[in-house]
Amino acid sequence: LKMFSLLSEFGWKPIMEKENIIGLQKQGKSITLEPGNQIELSGDKLNNIHEACAESHDYLFELQQVTKKLNLKIVSAGFDPISTLSEVPNNPKQRYQVMTKDMPNGGSLSLDMMYRTCGTQLNLDYDSEKDFIKKFKIVNSIVPISIALFANSSIVEKKNSGFSSYRSKVWQETSRGGLPEVFFDNMDFEKYADFSINFPLLFIQNEKEYLSGSNYSFSDFMNGKISEINNRLPTEDDLTTHLSTIFTENRLKKYIELRSMDTCGWDCLCSGPAFNTGILYGNLDEAYELVSKWDKNKIINAT
């Protein structure tokens, strides 16, 4: 709360959930806290990598000024190198309480993912369904390369984990995550819609309360089969929330979200986005032709 209060000096406004401040917003940007109080910047829609890099460094400068005043240090790594799971302070956000209860049922390291990992995520646009198909095929095919290039999470609980990216290991043993085989079969909008609709719900928002959705799919929601919320039908906000709980290495919203890179130090913050934009906004057809020859099973098993 002290950090959020000091950030208000830079024009950030609070986002409230009941009596709790759960984030900040300014223009098209927001700052939120993940389950283990990892700090996340969601940037504005920008035209190029240079604008995105400048925005990130402005945000980090503001954060640096605040942490100096509070005598805090920032750890920029893909996994908490010090704390045990039980030592991580919990975020009071309601949805995280439901996730903490249900997520371990589908993956043994799900709570480590929630409370101890940090990633560099990149949102990229597409201008047609054909463009999306090519880009989505490429980004899924290069996931092992992205993990290897930007690995930054070898230390766990003050010891060498034996992994260059322990964060990646955790994500492979996390509920609702991974690289689904169907992502390599020329995934188009209709196929992704089918995948998402039949994907299990994580939670359901009933007015201001979050309920477990573990017994239902989004298809059940669409067909009015969830008695706990009086069989109401989903809104666009419900769909947006559901899409954000599909924790695959890459996913589709109104943009393509790339999620396989560890958080890295400030000096390499723009490297991951530059790597991916170079591939996807360079010779797209050449990259697509190359990855189309790769064995999807080898890609999946390499992560």
What role is predicted for each listed range?
Residues 1-108, 116, 254, 268, ...:
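Terminal catalytic/cofactor-binding subdomain
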Residues 41, 122, 258:
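Conserved, mostly hydrophobic/aromatic
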Residues 45-52, 125-132, 262-266:
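A generic structural motif
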Residues 79-251:
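Loop-rich catalytic cores of soluble enzymes, especially ATP-dependent carboxylate-amine ligases
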Residues 216-299:
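Long, well-ordered mid-to-C-terminal structural blocks that present hydrophobic/aromatic surfaces
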